[in-house]
Amino acid sequence: AIDYTEENWSEQVKQATGGKGPDIILEMVGGSIAEQSLQCLAPFGRMVIYGAASNQIAQFTGIQLMYKNQAVIGYWLTAQMSRPDHIARAVMELIQYLIGGKLEIIVGQTFPLAAAAEAHKAIAERKTTGKVVLVV
């Protein structure tokens, strides 16, 4: 595992991939993390941006992508909601993965509903792992 909060994390990624870099990066932080992710992406690699947790805009140019034949695409779940046939198919696949034991939901912490504010604070302060569940 590589900790992206460490200063040299992108070099660790390159070392872990034999100097090549990953073929696919799923990026949801934005800002400098997204920029560093693109720098360590393999030639012909693809980066999917599906969030902006840092609330910062990543900045890169088309030339950066062109020289290494890379692509960056965006994904927003809300936009998928306009395609109910895709959602239905994906939900059925997820259910099959759960039934078949290929997918496990990891619950990191539970909070009573009355402690929802505390749960949100724990998430914001990055004190949680796995899913956080509010119990009614």
Region locations from a protein language model:
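Glycine-rich phosphate-binding loop and adjacent beta-alpha segment
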Residues: S32-K102, V135-V136
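Residues in well-ordered alpha-helical elements
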Residues: S10, D23, E35, I63, ...
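Adenosine-nucleotide cofactor-binding segment
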Residues: A1-I33, I87
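Solvent-exposed, non-membrane alpha-helical residues enriched in polar/charged side chains
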Residues: S10, K14, L38-Q39, I63, ...
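A structural signal for hydrophobic residues in beta-strands of small regulatory alpha/beta folds
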Residues: I2-D3, M81, V107
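Short catalytic-loop micro-motif centered on adjacent basic/acidic residues
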Residues: D23-L26, R46-I49, I105-G108
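C-terminal capping/lid region of NAD(P)-dependent oxidoreductase domains
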Residues: G19, I95, G100-T110, A117-V136
